[in-house]
């Protein structure tokens, strides 16, 4: 417990909240342009070729975003919407691309969990 004199000398510092998605600048989503679309391998013990895109956001940040779902139509200069949310087995990937908006089309032939992949209700 500090003395009153110590508290006068230097006041208590408030605890700063550290955001997990700083590139969004407090917004729920951000628009951006793909600069590179490629695959990377996850860390142990998983094995796959995960699809990711390097995206330049309107906030000025250059980030790596995961492309969820099976198959995609993204290429360089595609305009995408990015949300927060990391991919646990891909180090440095802290954002997801929102499917079914802007240039990212929804996942083809998706029946369950459609809202997460931008798919309309089948007739």
From Swiss-Prot:
Q: Which UniProt keywords apply?
A: Chloroplast, Plastid, Ribonucleoprotein, Ribosomal protein, RNA-binding, rRNA-binding
Instruction: List this protein's GO terms for biological process.
Output: translation
One annotated Gene Ontology cellular component of this protein: small ribosomal subunit
What Pfam family is a match for this entry? Ribosom_S12_S23
Tell me yes or no: is Protein biosynthesis among this UniProt entry's keywords: no
Please indicate which superkingdom the organism of origin belongs to. Eukaryota
Q: What is its main location?
A: plastid
Any idea where this protein resides?
Answer: Plastid, Chloroplast
InterPro entries reported in the protein's UniProt record: NA-bd_OB-fold (IPR012340), Ribosomal_uS12 (IPR006032), Ribosomal_uS12_bac (IPR005679)
Q: Which GO terms describe its molecular function?
A: rRNA binding; structural constituent of ribosome
Is Secreted a UniProt keyword of this protein? no
What is the annotated quaternary arrangement, including any partners? Answer: Part of the 30S ribosomal subunit.
Q: Which NCBIfam families match?
A: rpsL_bact
Similarity annotation: Belongs to the universal ribosomal protein uS12 family.
- What is the recorded function of this protein according to its Swiss-Prot or TrEMBL entry? With S4 and S5 plays an important role in translational accuracy. Located at the interface of the 30S and 50S subunits.
Family matches, as HAMAP family: Ribosomal_uS12_B (MF_00403_B)
What protein am I looking at? Small ribosomal subunit protein uS12cz/uS12cy
Give the species: Nandina domestica
- Gene field: rps12-A
């Amino acid at each position: 417990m500090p003395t009153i004199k110590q508290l006068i000398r230097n006041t208590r510092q408030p605890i700063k909240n550290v955001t997990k998605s700083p590139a969004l600048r407090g917004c729920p989503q951000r628009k951006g342009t793909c600069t590179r679309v490629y695959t990377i391998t996850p860390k142990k013990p998983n094995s796959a070729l995960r699809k990711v895109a390097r995206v330049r956001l309107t906030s000025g940040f250059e980030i790596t975003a995961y492309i969820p779902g099976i198959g995609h139509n993204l290429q360089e200069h595609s305009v995408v919407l990015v949300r927060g949310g990391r991919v646990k087995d891909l180090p440095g990937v802290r954002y997801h691309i929102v499917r079914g908006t802007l240039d990212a089309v929804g996942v083809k032939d998706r029946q369950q969990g459609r809202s997460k992949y931008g798919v309309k209700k089948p007739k």
